[in-house]
């Protein structure tokens, strides 16, 4: 299940969520919150929901930051990286043995952040032109918030891609890497699971391509009219 636009907007729980989570727990359903957001750790997400009145164990959260750290560690153990992102991403990378390096890193890794600026772009472009590889936590162009739709990871990465001529590798949904990890954490096969999300271009296509049943909610980014633009 996705989080932003499905479970909450900002710090506001969406209608019906409490009843849905109560049903999952009462029926002993295996579930995982699979979020493309890389800003917070699973513990921080757990505490955020607790403040809204939902008590859910930390083990029920998996983020694109964790997926990105796992991918980098599998590609190049003990790699170094210049990171554009929030503490949730930096912490996940540290835990995977990836060190920070703003001189000659193996990777430039980008996620959501509130500290993004022109100097960040200049630094990333310079490092990539010198040989660093560009990785992004997810391909979401926009995301829902209490203020409305806001720029997300891909909107921050696009200027770097355009300036370098390099295309980032996006680890989060709809990348099957993240979906397969989610299934392993749940201990189920794809035909036994469903993906609930608010985005046709990430959540729903990820579920389809991984063989899951899919459920689109209209409380986030995708509207009923938007659905007509997709062939699936």
Model-based region annotation:
Residues 1-29, 38-62, 69-232:
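Asp-based, Mg2+/Mn2+-dependent phosphohydrolase catalytic module
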């Amino acid at each position: 299940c996705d989080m932003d636009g499905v479970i909450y907007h900002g710090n506001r729980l969406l209608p019906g969520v409490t009843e849905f989570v109560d049903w999952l727990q009462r029926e002993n359903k295996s579930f995982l919150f699979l979020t493309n957001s890389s800003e917070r750790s699973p513990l921080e997400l757990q505490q955020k929901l607790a403040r809204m009145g939902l008590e859910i164990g930390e083990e029920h959260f998996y983020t694109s930051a964790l997926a990105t750290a796992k991918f980098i560690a599998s590609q190049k153990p003990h790699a170094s990286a210049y990171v554009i992102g929030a503490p949730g991403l930096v912490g996940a990378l540290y835990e995977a043995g990836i060190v920070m390096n703003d001189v000659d890193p193996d990777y430039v890794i980008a996620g959501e952040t509130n500290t993004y600026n022109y100097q960040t772009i200049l630094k990333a472009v310079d490092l990539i032109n010198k040989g660093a590889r560009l990785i992004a936590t997810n391909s979401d162009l926009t995301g829902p918030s209490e203020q409305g739709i806001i720029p997300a990871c891909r909107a921050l990465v696009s200027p770097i891609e355009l300036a370098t001529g390099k295309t980032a590798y996006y680890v989060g949904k709809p990348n099957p890497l993240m979906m397969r990890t989610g299934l392993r954490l749940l201990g189920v096969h794809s035909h036994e699971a469903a993906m609930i999300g608010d985005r046709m271009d990430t959540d729903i296509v990820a579920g389809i391509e991984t063989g899951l049943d899919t459920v689109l909610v209209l409380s986030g980014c995708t509207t009923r009219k938007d659905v007509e633009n997709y062939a699936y």
